[in-house]
Design a protein with these regions (language model features):
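Patatin-like phospholipase
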Residues: 1-191
Length: 191
């Protein structure tokens, strides 16, 4: 909250000046290295496995990238938070990437395949919520060089809703633990 009013943190000004709604240098270097120092060494020494979900714009598939050194692999983190239409594509790990929510919004199946079987799923929407189809004309135009990504964005609502159906089933069966708001939230996507 300390920096949320700083235009470098997130603003349309940053989008127009840098091509990213969240200014890369400020958010991924100045903030964690100087203003609010992140303990990179503690992260590096931790034995906890840490993954970020990204969308490969060339294949239209989700990628789950491990991060073992946050300072050296910060572009993986940046890619996972680079929202389409308001962020530049991030080139890292030999791929062109954007936010993972475009291709796998709730990656419970991906982590089950990795062997994780005690999932805690944190949702930002109330029980019963389902995503409606969205217009993707602008996405088609902006990402016309990446047809597989456009197809993935088009499929996103139905894939997301199917995943929610499975989560509710697994929750009833006691296979996963879900944390979600009890009522619809009245905040916007960027708040």
């Amino acid at each position: 909250m300390k920096y949320c009013r700083n235009w470098h943190f997130m603003s349309f000004r940053s989008l127009f000046l840098t091509g990213n709604i969240a200014e890369e240098k400020f958010c991924y270097h100045t903030l964690p290295e100087k203003l609010d120092p992140y303990d990179y060494e503690a992260f590096k020494k931790s034995h906890t496995k840490f993954y970020v979900g990204c969308s490969n714009v060339e294949t239209g598939k989700a990628e789950y990238l491990p991060i073992t050194d946050m300072k050296e692999e910060i572009d993986r983190m940046r890619a996972s938070a680079s929202l389409p239409l308001v962020s530049k594509i991030v080139k890292t790990a030999g791929m062109k990437l954007l936010d993972g929510g475009c291709t796998d919004s709730i990656p419970v199946k991906a982590f089950a395949k990795m062997g994780y079987n005690k999932d805690v799923v944190v949702l930002t929407r109330h029980k019963g919520y389902r995503k409606e189809k969205e217009g993707i004309s602008l996405t088609k135009l902006v990402y016309r060089k990446y047809p597989e990504f456009v197809k993935a964005v088009y499929r996103r609502p139905s894939v997301y809703n199917h995943t929610l159906d499975e989560i509710e089933k697994w929750e009833e069966e006691g296979k996963i633990f879900v944390i979600r708001p009890s009522v619809p939230l009245t905040i916007g996507r960027m708040e």
